[in-house]
């Protein structure tokens, strides 16, 4: 069951609809993630983690992740020029997602781009 299944708030102004299940078709092998959006809240599930954050560019409402060695990562996330960008400790860009036609381009901090296709969307009702 999606985390934001009960949310009916429209997407925030200027936010591109990335909702759905995305599967990599080039770039990093095994890429698969689900993106949920409601208002300015986003939940990304994949890669053995769940990001739950607001698109307000603050660390307070950003993604807080814990790595395998218990290291903490805190990212501010913003949506600008149709690109969702994760900024580690709000110091530098680490990950971005953008729509390119029918695909999503996921770019990691090392510059590797993964092109993903949306294999399903959430039903309207």
What residues fall within each predicted segment?
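Amphipathic/hydrophobic helical signal segments and adjacent flexible N-terminal regions
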Residues: 1-44, 48, 60-61, 65, ...
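Short, exposed beta-strand-loop hairpins at the edges of beta-sheets
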Residues: 103-111
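Contiguous, well-ordered beta-strand patches that form the walls/edges
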Residues: 27-28, 47-100
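Generic detector of short, aliphatic-rich beta-strand segments that form the cores of beta-sheets
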Residues: 115-117
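Short aromatic-centered micro-motifs
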Residues: 44, 53, 107
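A short, structured loop/turn motif at beta-sheet edges
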Residues: 37-40, 78-83, 98-103, 121-124
């Amino acid at each position: 069951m999606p985390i934001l299944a009960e949310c009916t708030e429209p997407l925030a102004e200027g936010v591109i609809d990335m909702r759905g299940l995305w599967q990599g078709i080039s770039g990093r092998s095994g890429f698969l993630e689900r993106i949920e959006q409601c208002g300015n809240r986003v939940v990304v599930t994949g890669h053995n983690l769940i990001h739950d954050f607001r698109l307000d560019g603050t660390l307070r409402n950003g993604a807080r992740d814990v790595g395998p060695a218990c290291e903490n990562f805190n990212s501010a996330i913003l949506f600008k020029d149709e690109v969702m960008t994760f900024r580690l400790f709000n110091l530098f860009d680490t990950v971005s997602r953008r729509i390119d036609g029918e695909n999503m381009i996921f770019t990691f901090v090392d510059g590797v781009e993964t092109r993903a296709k949306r294999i399903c969307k959430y039903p309207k009702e």
